Amino acid sequence: MTENNFDWHDIVNNVDPVLGKNFLELSEHIIEQESEIPKKYKELILMACLATSCNNKGTRHRGYEAMHQGATDKEILEALALASLAAGFSTLSESIGSLSDQFTIEPSPST
C-alpha cells in the first residue's frame, strides 16, 4: 500500500487559494447540508471510498466522524468490508488498522 507523504489540500491552497477555498466550501456544503442521506451515512460512504483508495488518514478521519454521528463498530466494519469487495481484502485489514484504537471491543482473553 502506498501512503502519500504530502497533503494535497496544502498544495492546492498554495498554488491556487481561490480553488482551495471553493473546494472546501463545496465539500462542506455536500457533507453538512440536510438531505435525504443522513450525515452518519454520508460519513460511512466517504470512509469506504477513502478506504478503497488506500487513504488511511482520510479513512480514519471519516470513520471517526461516522462514529461521532452515531455509527456503531458493526456499521463501520460492514462499510469497510463492502469497500474491500471492490478494492481487495487488504483494504479491510489496512482500514481496520487505521481505526483500531477507535473500536469499543474488548480484547479476547488469553487461553
For each feature predicted by the language model, list its residue ranges:
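Acidic, glycine/proline-rich low-complexity segments that act as flexible tails and inter-domain linkers
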Residues: 1-41, 94-111
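Alpha-helix C-capping/helix-to-loop hinge sites
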Residues: 29-33, 48-52, 83-86
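Residues at alpha-helix boundaries and short interhelical turns
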Residues: 35, 52-56, 70, 87-90
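Residue-level signature of transmembrane alpha-helical entry/exit and packing/kink sites
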Residues: 40-43, 78
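Amphipathic, charged-and-aliphatic alpha-helical interface segments
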Residues: 42-56
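Mid-chain, well-packed structural core segment of small domains
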Residues: 53-81
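Short alpha-helical linear motifs
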Residues: 64-71, 87, 98-107
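C-terminal structural segments of small proteins and small subunits
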Residues: 77-102
